């Protein structure tokens, strides 16, 4: 597989191909099931929502941030190999923690799905026991 797709766990890549792509209505090939402008709007709206910081600080529930490697200073804007997450985000939550994966990319759940699943399951169990 090309580019970042070569980092995906093989089973995750198959799931992505089965469920993340649709036949191209304009002819041969496939297109993303989530239109690129919709996906981009998720990231762009977070940058323009100035009230988000107050909302984050008001939360008292436990929050765990799973963050991939930081972007290189000279990276291309279309390079998705690093995390778009602010490195100090976890500290903005009153009960925030972070697990940092310095050698993983923005596609963290697709790279190490079993490890991510285990972390999520542990968090759910901890919340239920609290």
Locations of regions flagged by a protein language model:
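Conserved serine/cysteine hydrolase catalytic core
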Residues: 21-92, 97-100
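Catalytic histidine-centered segment of alpha/beta-hydrolase-like enzymes
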Residues: 98-113, 117
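Acidic/histidine metal-binding catalytic segments
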Residues: 6-20
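Hydrophobic, aliphatic-enriched repeat segments that assemble into extended interaction scaffolds
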Residues: 64-66, 117, 121
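C-terminal alpha-helix
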Residues: 119-130
